[in-house]
């Protein structure tokens, strides 16, 4: 039961109690009276001697409070005093009646409020029941959609946890940045603007000196080969791919020539990235088939050995035609003096920091390697060097700074075994190993711009890095 209803019940019980007292007790005020008050489980003898006394500690079987007024002992001589006490008691009863009336009014007001609230609660309960029914309908209709949304949101929980962690770190970083800014501000004040300008000038001076130093770098000696880096896997077991060592920094075209014979299609790619992705930019149909895989692109033109001959062809990519052709005198061809793997690799054309070269063998030199420097325009032999290294015993070869480096095999375990310097016309045996990852090298050429070896290894286009020992010229050396 609510609090206002309890309050109303208490008031009604109190009014009944007072009414019972006035009807039963007040008529006996004229005489003596001795009353026993019933309290739960006890009986108490009361002998009034000092005037009227009011007790309200007893309860009837219905739980109502029973107030009992005990009159003092009767004394005819003290009637005036008793009358005075009666008046006082009546005043108290009147005051109590007034209080009860006020309490009754409040209780009625509270009771009306309770009734109003009860009506409102019933309406609210019905409203909630309606909302609950609507909610169930809504949940039945959209439960799967909400579940999918929740499933989508579940992965965000660890993200939010991480975000909170990151937020703490960001706060720390902000604090550190503030501290660092303060330190930098102090440093800047100590150094001053003029010191920054001086430091900038020193950096520019160092850059100039570095460029001058790079210009004084002479051709280096091969010390080490590392790699390989596999750029792409394509084509047959044998072929060639190359870039132009004299091209500008913005020109990174790649040329691709698959197979060592019976082909005359050259594919061009604008960059290494396009080559890897297969985004071919142009195709050239050469007027002649090539022999071998030892071609070279130099200053915008392709140099290759014409099939079944010792003729060298110069083909311009820009003009799309042959610019020059010349027979390499006494040079063996068509697998007379190839490298160890064969493939019509009799004539090897290559380029380095010095210029254009041809490596081949002749009967006059007993099948040993001959090195010839060529004029890039006319293909005329400018100068030749005869070595004592058998061409058929060489796996591959390449030129770096006028020195020919020869590998002892095209198979696993190959190394740079022999070198010949055209500057000093001397040779030496070397021991520079490299990793033949795919077991069969059919093309190995040096690119001076990239400072790298381009190789075709069993259908894989790979790159090797080279380490050169450089000598820096000083003003005293010039």
Curated annotation (Swiss-Prot):
Primary location group: secreted
Q: Does this entry carry the keyword GTP-binding?
A: no
- The Olfactomedin-like domain is annotated at 218-470
Q: In which tissues is it expressed?
A: Expressed in the brain (at protein level).
GO biological process terms, alphabetically, are: eye photoreceptor cell development
**Glycosylated residue positions:** 33, 95, 179, 299, 465
Gene Ontology CC entries for this record:
AMPA glutamate receptor complex; extracellular space; Golgi apparatus; synapse
Between which residues do disulfide bridges form?
Answer: 219-401
Where in the cell does this protein reside? Secreted; Synapse
Q: Name one Pfam family in it.
A: OLF
Tell me which positions the record assigns to the signal sequence: 1-23
UniProt keyword annotations, A-Z: Coiled coil, Disulfide bond, Glycoprotein, Secreted, Signal, Synapse
Q: Could you confirm whether the keyword Transmembrane helix appears in this record?
A: no
Please give the coiled-coil regions recorded for this protein.
77-217
Q: Which SUPFAM superfamilies match?
A: YVTN repeat-like/Quinoprotein amine dehydrogenase (SSF50969)
Please, which domain of life does this record's source organism belong to? Eukaryota
Tell me, how does this one assemble?
Answer: Peripherally associated with AMPAR complex. AMPAR complex consists of an inner core made of 4 pore-forming GluA/GRIA proteins (GRIA1, GRIA2, GRIA3 and GRIA4) and 4 major auxiliary subunits arranged in a twofold symmetry. One of the two pairs of distinct binding sites is occupied either by CNIH2, CNIH3 or CACNG2, CACNG3. The other harbors CACNG2, CACNG3, CACNG4, CACNG8 or GSG1L. This inner core of AMPAR complex is complemented by outer core constituents binding directly to the GluA/GRIA proteins at sites distinct from the interaction sites of the inner core constituents.
Q: What is this protein called?
A: Noelin-3
Which species is the source of this protein?
A: Mus musculus
Primary gene name: Olfm3
